[in-house]
């Protein structure tokens, strides 16, 4: 009985390891998770860049794919309407998560990608599903004042703030061509957080 349990657990570990693995290269930690439900597949890939000497601790790039065979049919690709349009807009989502540690809850009123200062930015809430996602131009930074009532508070512990920036496929293709990622975040207190790193995105098949 003990041997059966041991080999059962071993098989489970191998199975999980097949769908979930980590790879660290040049300060970038790579994760991939594949989940299947019915005939549908969800693939989540994350690329985490770690910072050492700053309140800005992590830059995380996330590519999420939802594969629904029924909606990938040629007829559906040419179809129009809310369901078809929503799937086309959301089947692949690109996102940057910026993780900033402080003793306060922060809001971020501006995100600037150097070289694309004229990019079209939206500030609607990151709720899905939403018709607004079908109208995403360059990138969305969410509502900067969603936690405004807490901005004045200071805490005796570290607050881990996360700014989620969803980018369009077209804008992703543009920043993928850059040699370096130069990004500036501006908080509700006008504090600037600057990023200047080698662009790791072209190294991966995205």
From Swiss-Prot:
UniProt-listed Pfam families: BPTA
Keyword set, alphabetical order: Cell outer membrane, Membrane, Plasmid, Signal, Virulence
Record flagged with keyword Signal: yes
GO cellular-component term (any): cell outer membrane
Homology family: Belongs to the BptA family.
Summary of the function given for this chain in its UniProt record: Virulence-associated protein essential for survival of the bacterium within the tick host and therefore within the natural life cycle of the Lyme disease spirochete.
Name recorded for this polypeptide: Protein BptA
Species name: Borreliella burgdorferi (strain ATCC 35210 / DSM 4680 / CIP 102532 / B31) (Borrelia burgdorferi)
Gene of this entry: bptA
